[in-house]
């Protein structure tokens, strides 16, 4: 085991000098004793002359030149398997929940090759989420990749927690949650939410939160993914939740300049597409098992053309776009039904009835969008009878796309609702065909199935 010495420390980036004949490989883990703390460094570049440039997987406070550094001669390895379920771990797989050792039987390196072409499998099976707007407009595929896109404060994390609750309870498989650069409070809330709904023993939690150094945030997604890959390779269907994939990119940006790379567009790292690809290509389903992933994607300044969300788009099967405009109307989940897409929305996959209903809903909402300008200038009275009907139905559809969430009961005061796909299609089809034209639009707001809307109308 070779030993080197620290020669330079710039924030999270540490340069270490080794003997010329024992230079560590790229991605090898190094260990340094920083006072009472053990700090792990990951090799990023070999600079020549025996010097390697590394990223610290923890705070570099207190490091000084001349400290001894050990080469562990392997990449960072984390615990995998059933021992990780119900536990909270950090980027190195160390427990942070005060419940003692993990007690794992196996450890895997966090850098692994993506599955080869012949190992990949293609599934057309739908995953029901119980959230009306998602099941109807952008259905999820089992073993597919889903992105929740939204600016600050439009409900990405709440939507994700609802999805985890619904899918974990209904689907009863294992899940891995990777908290990448998010609020510690949300991580804490999430743990208690899982404990209260009795699914904590089926979830592994890996956190590298906002206050952690960039090295942790850059690698914690890989730690969570490695744990999910182990479950997949045992032949299971796993769910991988990443909140938030944008912070993974951001952590890469933070260390990129310190590693001496020229910034590219908007100051992002030049290797943005490659870093994203390395992560996303591993999140895939094989003939042995599947990984279904749901990723929250923060959209800087609500601009979907920003390089980071734009790079993420290319890798996804379904995109759920959360809109500030819809949130401002008080309609939650604030999913934009005209912007959200899914590869599964194909009559050969979802069936003709589902496809026609979804496209019908979109065309009514699109027409309403076009008529809004006329209404703003001339008022409703100037519209033709046909257009008045379209507007009335569109407003009902818009309200019926809202739904009370289980995880938001504390805020809304109304009990959460899980709506089956069959009921969702029936409800929207009925509104489009004019079966509920006699009901007031308020009856459709924050209800589950269409029967509840009819009941609510009687009380208004």
UniProtKB/Swiss-Prot annotation:
GO terms for cellular component: plasma membrane; proton-transporting ATP synthase complex. GO terms for molecular function: ATP binding; ATP hydrolysis activity; proton-transporting ATP synthase activity, rotational mechanism. It is a peripheral membrane protein. Keywords: ATP synthesis, ATP-binding, Cell inner membrane, Cell membrane, CF(1), Hydrogen ion transport, Ion transport, Membrane, Nucleotide-binding, Translocase, Transport. The keyword Ion transport applies. It catalyses: ATP + H2O + 4 H(+)(in) = ADP + phosphate + 5 H(+)(out). Gene3D superfamilies: 2.40.10.170, Bovine Mitochondrial F1-atpase, Atp Synthase Beta Chain, Chain D, domain 3, P-loop containing nucleotide triphosphate hydrolases. It is an enzyme of class 7 (translocase). It comes from the Bacteria. Its EC number is 7.1.2.2. PANTHER family: ATP SYNTHASE, ATP SYNTHASE SUBUNIT BETA, MITOCHONDRIAL. Produces ATP from ADP in the presence of a proton gradient across the membrane. The catalytic sites are hosted primarily by the beta subunits. F-type ATPases have 2 components, CF(1) - the catalytic core - and CF(0) - the membrane proton channel. CF(1) has five subunits: alpha(3), beta(3), gamma(1), delta(1), epsilon(1). CF(0) has three main subunits: a(1), b(2) and c(9-12). The alpha and beta chains form an alternating ring which encloses part of the gamma chain. CF(1) is attached to CF(0) by a central stalk formed by the gamma and epsilon chains, while a peripheral stalk is formed by the delta and b chains. This is ATP synthase subunit beta. It comes from Escherichia coli O9:H4 (strain HS). The lineage of its organism: Bacteria, Pseudomonadati, Pseudomonadota, Gammaproteobacteria, Enterobacterales. The gene is atpD.
